[in-house]
UniProtKB/Swiss-Prot annotation:
Full protein name: 2-dehydro-3-deoxyphosphooctonate aldolase
Keyword Cytoplasm: yes
Family the UniProt entry places it in: Belongs to the KdsA family.
Cleavable signal peptide: none
Encoding gene, per UniProt annotation: kdsA
Annotated source species: Chlamydia caviae (strain ATCC VR-813 / DSM 19441 / 03DC25 / GPIC) (Chlamydophila caviae)
Pathway participation: Carbohydrate biosynthesis; 3-deoxy-D-manno-octulosonate biosynthesis; 3-deoxy-D-manno-octulosonate from D-ribulose 5-phosphate: step 2/3; Bacterial outer membrane biogenesis; lipopolysaccharide biosynthesis
EC number: 2.5.1.55
Keyword annotations of the record: Cytoplasm, Lipopolysaccharide biosynthesis, Transferase
Amino acid sequence: MFSDKMILIAGPCVIEEEETTLEIASRIQELVTPYADRIHWIFKSSYDKANRSSINSYRGPGLNEGLRILSKVKDTLGVEILTDVHSPEEARAAAKVCDILQIPAFLCRQTDLLVAAAETNAVINIKKGQFLSPWDMQGPVDKVLSTGNNKIILTERGCSFGYNNLVSDMRSIPVLSGMGFPVVFDGTHSVQLPGGLKTHSGGQTEFIPTLTRAALAAGAHGLFIETHANPAIAKSDAASMLSLKTFEALLPLWDQLYTCVRSFEMASV
């Protein structure tokens, strides 16, 4: 589905203004273009962050306006698009624009959502719930496969570890890989401190380089990275997003590590 290239799902957490979204997408494209023969970039952003900590938090422009902006990004840059969906109705609408439909971690066991998304024949990215063991993801996988759609990505995004904290168990990467689909590591949500700032989530972005290196070394097929020109003023997940400047600095490291691990795996066959 993605050949041997490293999968890189990258973009801002939530769609802000059209101009801002296009600027971020354009900058990411500039940064990844030199790696085009080795990295498969997919732009991501959400039209609705339905699980914000506070009722007063910005959720996004909504389904219709959000899909219009994502369509503009797709047409302008010629990039594949991923967004998350929350209901069967949203899945059917989003599939008209997006190449990949993402099942949010909190919704990864919702049968009707999984089946409806899969029936669109889009690629389905299932994020592992913070409350699930990696082997429990076989259930969501089977629900997608029941429709005849076998275009699946599995994303590891950390596991709940007490209150307001997540940990990443790298053993989950080979376990998930054993299900036969590409495994992506979410390097930004994995450093979240859910609800850690009372009305919004905190984060420890200083650990993103360490965790992303570990995930690639463990055999992950790619990374999921939320990035913004200025995370401090971002409208969602400001505490856990990576700045575009740091994203640029980490790209060659990710590329080299992924290439090294894949070369070693090929030599071991």
